């Protein structure tokens, strides 16, 4: 009787052990939910999707990313808080869109050195100290750089003065455009086309690339040169979710994030292509003389850092040292 019982138990025990090992293996794979604060048809998402596919293809059994979508999944200005509270695990976002979480998020526009150097000189660690403490967020990687912002307008100007113009803004250039005497209007990117069409705004601020993704070229007459600041689009992650990752998962994610950042050379080429496309589309360039252009850029940074100092003096002082050339 004992012999028979053992014979029955042995296969059962083997099955239980196999199931246990299988469950253990599955437990080592984590799936992270990611949203984009930008529209899905835009260049930023289009650059992100192949990276997600690569992460998933190479990360089976370790880490997967589930892309939930753009603003239809989580509205643009709520994505930062969704990461902070853990509604989602990750977001592709820009600091200007989550100043409601912490004002320091907008300071990233003022970086004048590449992200690779930021990782070496302590800037990246300084960013994460603030993001961890104030945003319950881990700053993972910067995937867009070398994309200066520009003023786009339907009213021609011959000097850096936007008096009488209604300009769509985000926190990125609110202070600067107000210093140029603009009447500023805040609206999500998805509503700008209609605002231009109806004359609610005369122009807007945006990087050198991306206006074709939103069809804004159809309602835009002029671009003001030179550009200023540097468009920042980054991946962020809920801090508790980040800390929950195993060493293997965290190391794998970090490896893939560095691969993503290494592709940032794309943005300089893209900016050149977009400049040519704008000219072909009939957008005229407004240029100032050399002295005025230099003063224009200097004023942008002067105003930007002044605003940062008012909002968070200690952090701004630390960042200015690390972000400047």
Curated annotation (Swiss-Prot):
Annotated positions binding phenylglyoxylate: 168-173
Signal sequence interval, chain numbering: 1-27
Protein's job: Solute-binding protein that binds phenylglyoxylate (in vitro). Probably part of a tripartite ATP-independent periplasmic (TRAP) transport system that mediates solute transport into the cytoplasm.
Pfam families the record matches: DctP
Descriptive protein name: Solute-binding protein Bpro_4736
Classification via CDD domains: PBP2_TRAP_DctP1
Gene Ontology cellular component list: periplasmic space
The UniProt record lists the keyword Nucleotidyltransferase: no
Ranges in a coiled coil: none
Record note on quaternary structure: The complex is comprised of an extracytoplasmic solute-binding protein and a heteromeric permease formed by two transmembrane proteins.
One annotated GO biological process: transmembrane transport
Keywords: Periplasm, Signal, Transport
């Amino acid at each position: 009787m004992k012999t028979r019982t053992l014979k029955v138990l042995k296969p059962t025990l083997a099955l239980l052990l196999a199931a246990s090992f299988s469950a253990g293996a599955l437990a080592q794979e984590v799936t992270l939910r990611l949203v984009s604060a930008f529209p899905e048809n835009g260049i930023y998402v289009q650059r992100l999707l192949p990276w997600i596919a690569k992460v998933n293809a190479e990360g089976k059994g370790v880490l997967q990313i589930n892309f939930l979508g753009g603003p239809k999944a989580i509205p643009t200005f709520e994505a930062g808080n969704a990461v902070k509270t853990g509604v989602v695990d990750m977001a592709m976002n820009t600091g200007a869109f989550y100043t409601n979480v912490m004002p320091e998020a907008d300071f990233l526009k003022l970086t004048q050195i590449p992200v690779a150097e930021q990782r070496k000189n302590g800037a990246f660690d300084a960013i994460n100290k603030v993001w961890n403490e104030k945003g319950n967020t881990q700053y993972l990687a910067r995937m867009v750089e070398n994309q200066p912002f520009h003023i786009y307008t339907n009213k021609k100007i011959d000097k850096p003065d936007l008096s009488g113009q209604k300009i769509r803004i985000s926190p990125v250039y609110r202070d600067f455009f107000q210093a140029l005497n603009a009447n500023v209007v805040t609206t999500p990117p998805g509503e700008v086309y209609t605002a231009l069409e109806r004359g609610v705004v005369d122009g807007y601020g945006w990087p050198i690339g991306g206006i074709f993704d939103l069809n804004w070229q159809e309602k835009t007459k002029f671009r003001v040169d030179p550009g200023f600041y540097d468009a920042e689009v980054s991946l962020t992650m809920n801090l508790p979710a980040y800390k929950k990752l195993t060493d293997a998962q965290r190391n794998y994610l970090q490896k893939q994030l560095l691969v993503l950042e290494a592709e940032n050379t794309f943005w300089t080429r893209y900016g050149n292509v977009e400049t040519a496309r704008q000219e072909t589309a009939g957008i005229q360039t407004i240029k100032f003389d050399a002295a005025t252009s230099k003063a224009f850029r200097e004023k942008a940074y002067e105003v930007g850092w002044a605003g940062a100092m008012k909002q968070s003096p200690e952090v701004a002082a630390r960042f200015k040292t690390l972000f400047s050339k």
